């Protein structure tokens, strides 16, 4: 079935309105703005659903950010309130304390700490500004666990987690998001690699597999299936022991 971007966009906007009506009728929406397609399109959906006065964008560079102009373009385009909180000194200080304590820190720890600091920042701002924090993960990322647990995988509500990367782009065009943001190549901003470089396959291949079950390369199928099974725990509540004695 062909994806109907207009229908999906309107349904998502209505869902956001309904969610806030039940979970924060007077609350603002707090969203981290990276300048990538997911945060840009989620922010545009929030503006359509709630009005720009109830959407607060937070830009969170880690000392410097080469594409911070993309994030600024988005908040200027939407006309939303926005704040910049540089997490660089916090990141450096915490990393120094950890290294002083345990010695060597893994590269994965270095890469995953900034998203966790950013999410802590969003919640601090949310509690100070009567807000609910938006999650901006999409279905393609969630499918293979390409997110940081308690970092960008966190949030109070998740508007775009039912949509693949291709579908999100189509919705972005429906919303009039600048094309440069829709087509921006996603990366983690620290390793120097794109998402697709790190995953070992393209989002186009992944999206097709998710929606149709079709894939041409059996090795890539095996890798996607392995990542999916290995990372399902990220989408569940914390596993807990239930004592029935």
Give the label of every model feature segment.
Residues 1-31, 53-56, 63, 72-90, ...:
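ATP/NTP-dependent adenylation/nucleotidyl-transfer catalytic domains that generate, transfer
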Residues 36:
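Conserved G/P- and acidic residue-centered "switch" motifs that form tight phosphate/ATP-binding loops
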Residues 39, 60-62:
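Extended, folded domain segments that form the structural surfaces/walls around functional sites
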Residues 40-43, 68-72:
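Short, surface-exposed alpha-helical segments at coil->helix boundaries
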Residues 44-48:
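Short, well-ordered alpha-helices that flank and scaffold nucleotide-derived cofactor binding pockets
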Residues 116:
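Catalytic-core regions of hydrolytic enzymes
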């Amino acid at each position: 079935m062909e994806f109907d971007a207009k229908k999906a966009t309107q349904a998502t906007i209505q869902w956001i309105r309904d969610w806030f009506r039940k979970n924060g009728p007077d609350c603002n929406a707090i969203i981290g703005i990276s300048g990538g397609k997911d945060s840009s399109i989620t922010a545009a959906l929030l503006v359509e659903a709630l009005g720009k006065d109830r959407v607060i964008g937070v830009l969170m560079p880690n000392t410097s950010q080469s594409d911070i102009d993309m994030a600024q373009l988005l908040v200027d385009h939407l006309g939303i309130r926005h704040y910049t909180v540089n997490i660089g000194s916090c990141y450096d200080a915490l990393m120094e304390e950890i290294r002083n304590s345990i010695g060597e820190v893994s590269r994965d720890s270095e890469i995953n700490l900034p998203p966790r600091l950013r999410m802590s920042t969003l919640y601090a701002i949310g509690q100070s500004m009567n807000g609910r924090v938006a999650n901006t993960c999409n279905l393609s990322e969630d499918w293979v666990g390409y997110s940081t647990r308690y970092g960008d995988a966190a949030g109070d509500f998740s508007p775009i987690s039912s949509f693949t990367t291709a579908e999100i782009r189509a919705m972005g065009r429906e919303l009039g998001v600048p094309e440069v943001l829709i087509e921006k190549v996603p990366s983690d901003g620290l390793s120097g690699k794109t998402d697709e470089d790190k995953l070992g396959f393209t989002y186009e291949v992944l999206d097709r597999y998710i929606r149709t079950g079709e894939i041409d390369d059996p090795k890539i199928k095996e890798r996607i299936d392995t990542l999916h099974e290995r990372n399902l725990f990220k989408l569940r509540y914390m596993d807990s022991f239930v004592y029935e004695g």
